[in-house]
Regions:
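Short, polar/acidic, helix-capping and beta-turn segments at strand->helix junctions
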Residues: 1-109
Length: 109
């Protein structure tokens, strides 16, 4: 069980965090990489890090993206085994988004 202050990140996507421009249209692997970069940055800004992710929810618009998305996520979560839920949904908020990832982490005591 994780102990500490909770950090809840809303669903993150492959967007430039400053311009809101969608990046890597049509490429689920690169969208996942950018999404994980955003998550890493936001967790660090909150005082946490990927090592303290305790829950992750992954939304995919196509089940065929699952393997490459999870392989890319695994590069960012080496040695971390959070509770995980994966969902296939008909669409995300913007048609160019192929994957959205939501995480909960802690700032350890």
């Amino acid at each position: 069980m994780a102990k500490g202050t909770n950090v809840f990140l809303r669903g993150q996507v492959s967007q430039d965090l400053e311009t809101r421009e969608t990046l890597y249209v049509g490429d689920p692997k690169l969208q996942t990489r950018k999404t994980m970069e955003n998550i890493d940055l936001l967790l660090k800004e909150a005082g946490s890090c990927m090592d303290h992710v305790c829950r992750i929810v992954v939304y995919l618009v196509d089940i065929r993206y699952r393997e490459e998305v999870y392989q890319e996520m695994g590069k960012w979560l080496k040695g971390v085994h959070p509770c995980s839920t994966g969902l296939v949904v008909p669409a995300l908020a913007r048609p160019d988004w192929l994957v959205e990832i939501e995480v909960t982490a802690v700032i350890p005591d």
